[in-house]
Amino acid sequence: WGPETNQQISHVFHKVEKDFLITSGMIIPVKILDTIGGYPKNFFIDGIDIDICAKAKSKGFGIYCVKGCVLKQQFGSNLTFTFWGKTYPASNYNPQRLYGIFRNHIIIYRSTHSLAVLKLIKGYSVAFIRAILLFENNKINKLQAIARGVKDGILYKI
C-alpha cells in the first residue's frame, strides 16, 4: 500500500537540489515535459539528461536528488588507472560515442547559455582527454571524433 494520491510525501525523503541528474530513474511530470519542450529529438543518447535539466532550470523548475535511492549503472568499460599515485577513471568509449557526447553538449550550451552546462563541458573535456591520452587505446581516432563533435556542435550540425 502506498501513500494516498496527491498526498505530500516530501517529509519522508531527504532531497538535495542539483544542477543536473541523469534521466535514468528520473520522475518527470508530463506537464513539465510539455512546458520545456520535451526530450531532444536529434540526440542519440548523450546529453539528453543535461538538456532536460538545463531547460527545466531555465523555466524555474528545480532538479532534486532524493538521497538514499541507488541506481547501479555502468558507463563505458568502467576502468580505473593509477598515474603518479592518483587513480583516474577511464570510460574507454568508442569514437562515435565521444563524438556524440561533445557535439550534443556544445549544442546544449549554445541553446541554453547555461554556465552550469559550460562548467560540465569543461570537466568532461579534461577527464575524457586526459584518460584517452594517458590510458586508452585508439587515441588518434578518439581525439579526431572529439574534434569533429566540437566542430559540429559549434556549427549546430545535427
Where are the language model's segments positioned?
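A short acidic, glycine-rich active-site loop
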Residues: 85-99
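Active-site donor/metal-binding and catalytic loop motifs
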Residues: 66-89
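Acidic/His-rich active-site region of diverse nucleotide-sugar glycosyltransferases
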Residues: 1-38
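Aromatic-acidic/polar surface patches that form glycan- and anion
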Residues: 21-22, 45-46, 94, 98, ...
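Non-catalytic, C-terminal membrane-associated alpha-helical segments of glycosyltransferases
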Residues: 110-158
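A conserved mid-domain beta-alpha-beta active-site/ligand-binding segment of alpha/beta enzyme cores
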Residues: 101-106
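A short, conserved alpha-helix in the catalytic core of glycosyltransferases
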Residues: 26, 32-37, 42-70
